[in-house]
Design a protein with these regions (language model features):
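Soluble ligand-binding/transfer domains with enclosed cavities or grooves
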Residues: 2-160
Length: 160
């Protein structure tokens, strides 16, 4: 069986770029999933590995990072230290492991891969009146810029 770190490397290695769309509840509490409240173009994740055990995650166009950018070393030794990451061939993500009323939100990130295309969905819940409510949804359709055979852009919604 392939270990989680190896699946993570196979899924995510690449220079991923796409347009990020964020949907957030308005003042009345309505969550409109057809009209984004924020678009970030481009959203870029450059994920590279220097050897079998080490790499770098470098992101820009990020919704929650200071200045929209972040860079982190990644390694087999520290991968999934919190136990919230999961990988399968062609799918990977991370999830909050529990609800903590002291934290401002919890979430799930789901990535689905097809060839060198990647669809990422981020779901964020926030507390409201003692309950958790889905507050924000982020979606990015990525293409890998490192691909030798780039895939064409997807048609706009509603087109054949």
């Amino acid at each position: 069986m392939t270990d989680q770190w190896t699946l993570n490397r196979r899924n995510f290695a690449g220079h991923w770029q796409g347009c990020g769309s964020w949907f957030e509840r308005d003042g009345s509490g309505r969550l409109d999933l057809q009209h984004p409240t924020r678009r970030i173009d481009p959203t870029t994740y450059a994920i590279s590995f220097s050897d079998d055990d080490h790499g770098v995650w470098d992101g820009s166009g990020l919704a929650f990072a200071p200045g929209g950018k972040a860079t982190y070393p990644i390694s087999r030794a520290t991968y999934n230290a919190g136990g919230g990451c999961w990988q399968f061939p062609g799918a990977g993500g991370q999830s909050s492991r529990g609800l903590d009323a002291e934290r401002p939100r919890f979430g799930h990130e789901i990535n689905l891969f097809c060839g060198r295309s990647r669809s990422m969905l981020v779901l964020l819940w926030e507390p409201l009146d003692g309950r958790w409510r889905l507050q924000r949804v982020g979606a990015v359709g990525f293409r890998c810029l490192n691909s030798a055979d780039p895939e064409p852009d997807s048609p706009a919604c509603g087109t054949p």
